[in-house]
Amino acid sequence: MEISVFGGGAWGRALAFAFGEKNEVKIISRRDLNEPLKKLNDALISKGSAPIEQVDLETGLKASLYVVAISVQHLREWFQNASLPKNAKVLIASKGIEVLNKAFVSEIAKDFIEPNHLCFLAGPSFAAEIIQGLPCALVIHSNNQALALEFANKTPSFIRAYAQQDIIGGEIAGAYKNVIAIAGGVCDGLKLGNSAKASLLSRGLVEMQRFGAFFGGKTETFLGLSGAGDLFLTANSILSRNYRVGLGLAQNKPLEVVLEELGEVAEGVKTTNAIVEIAKKYGIYTPIASELALLLKGKSVLESMNDLIRRA
């Protein structure tokens, strides 16, 4: 089976490596991936698998399955330019909310791909661990369970992929946990202790579920891998970009400096503002996201965390 992965960042390369164990994988990216792919291809070849090949867009569109790992803020433009077939089978691995239109990923994608041909990847995982072949469990959300299982069956031996419905719950959980992860990084950076951190994450999970339920997300999704699992991973590890943003803010660094030092996209920053605006529009109570938005705009980190712990 031939699979095309769109997106040459760390996440896109990790997914190309993962799917490469059982499948012929092409990767499409503007950047030259010759050097980043070398080690991954050596590992694949040692397993008897075919190496990942970087190809142009025209060649990439000839695959049977598509995996999209493009930053959410650029996803709509990417779909417009890529011109995927309307009936393409697509697994979207991007997590976040489009700030410009306050749109969820599924709302963006359905303008370009038949809804029954869409799947969304969720659950706790880091690119750095996937390329090491470390075990993890993920969820593929789709209204088309046959397609979700088709993608699940293409995953490697070290990934346990579950097929579930509840697209909206899965994508909101994946986006919202990045917001809570920033707050988790701040909490640890200020050395507020394990009790405060546990309170923050517990209330953060409740907040995620409350927001998701408004749009039809199911409670069990937020209590499973897509919600609690991804939250507890992302809010507790230095491998998380959003967690590292929180650590930087705890050092009283301006957000611009933190992001410059990070050198990578931390979706939680823009997702925070999108969530707060959506919550205001619909009257959803989101104390952690609301307080974090103030912190990102320059509020004192100590004052912000004190207010957050009291309100959450």
UniProtKB/Swiss-Prot annotation:
Residues at which sn-glycerol 3-phosphate binds: 95, 123, 125, 177, 230, 240-242
A Pfam family: NAD_Gly3P_dh_C
Reaction it catalyzes: sn-glycerol 3-phosphate + NAD(+) = dihydroxyacetone phosphate + NADH + H(+); sn-glycerol 3-phosphate + NADP(+) = dihydroxyacetone phosphate + NADPH + H(+)
Pathway: Membrane lipid metabolism; glycerophospholipid metabolism
Gene Ontology molecular function: any one: NAD binding
Active site: 177
Gene3D superfamilies xref list: N-(1-d-carboxylethyl)-l-norvaline Dehydrogenase, domain 2, NAD(P)-binding Rossmann-like Domain
Principal subcellular localization: cytoplasm
Keywords: Cytoplasm, Lipid biosynthesis, Lipid metabolism, NAD, NADP, Nucleotide-binding, Oxidoreductase, Phospholipid biosynthesis, Phospholipid metabolism
Keyword NAD listed: yes
Cited HAMAP family: NAD_Glyc3P_dehydrog
Entries under PANTHER family matching the protein: GLYCEROL-3-PHOSPHATE DEHYDROGENASE, GLYCEROL-3-PHOSPHATE DEHYDROGENASE [NAD(+)] 2, CHLOROPLASTIC
Name of the protein: Glycerol-3-phosphate dehydrogenase [NAD(P)+]
Organism encoding this protein: Helicobacter acinonychis (strain Sheeba)
